């Protein structure tokens, strides 16, 4: 304790705090001024050091600067990353062995060419995957997150299998590289979407940087464990495969738990369908936490294996349909209906085709119109099984309840600015001032 003489101006106590926000502040010293100056510093140095270390791995203002689901997701994501880099050492060891590292007969140019083909295939695969699926990743981030890690596991499996097929080595490793290229695109894109979701204080860059630190730490720990595991299992194929398969099972389990922790408040096809179905039945809106526990996260091909009597409502709606692809009879009915006064200023049209609802969007439709068209289509799909006059009943329901639905969604914490959907490339334009109807 240190004391210095000061002028007598009453008693004043000043506390010194350290931290970047109120959620991380802690007291480091207490200064008392009366007839003398007294400075008492905090004795808890460990707490100070621990907070400094933590600042390298969690966003500034944590936990108040991120959503509540951040901690659970990052915990399971770190565990899956740890298992990934541990088993990566096993697959890399097998790959290097197949290329010929350590063999006298192996040539530098031969190994270089094989590595070139492997990387070239992966780069080409990444471009093709982005071309075909890049615009779909935002709308189903949970599913694509799982798919990304599944494809990574398949890629590592190909590397581990490569020594067993020396005559088809190039084909096997190229398939593995192709699989991992899908991982790079899907994982990076969904990570960007999730970072925006976690950011409560416009701190996406900080969250991304700290996530990079977490991943680097998991990488270093995983590679260290992987080196030990590779050393202990070297020359024992049974132990290698048992270790790899065990780590793969844990990896997928950790990924599943990670995406299950996510509570997204954006509207996509499935979440909108769940919300609307419940609203029609009860007049109430489910919370993001409730919907999160109800929505599916498995890939589409996995959910299609389940035996169901009827398709979910969101799978019976086709958004942004190309008009010329409709059956001629349905197209004629649609064109005749455009002349009705109710459609003159409409921003979308609905067509009922073989139990499904097709949505034709106007070329001037806005994000709010896209959301309304999809909600209207879900209402129509729900009414088709209950009434023969579903078109008129659907119109009446939208006119009466749509604004109420939006208000309750906003009050419940949902984002209603837009519908997260795959890219809509087909739109239409209709003119009904005479008997003419024009479509672009």
Curated annotation (Swiss-Prot):
InterPro entries: RUS_fam (IPR006968), UVB_sens_C (IPR055412), UVB_sens_RUS_dom (IPR054549). GO terms for cellular component: membrane. The keyword Glycoprotein does not apply. Coiled coil: none annotated. Pfam families: UVB_sens_C (PF24160), UVB_sens_prot (PF04884). The chain crosses the membrane at residues 109-129, 154-174, 232-252. It is found in: Membrane. It comes from the Eukaryota. Keywords: Membrane, Transmembrane, Transmembrane helix. It is a multi-pass membrane protein. Belongs to the RUS1 family. This is Protein root UVB sensitive 3.
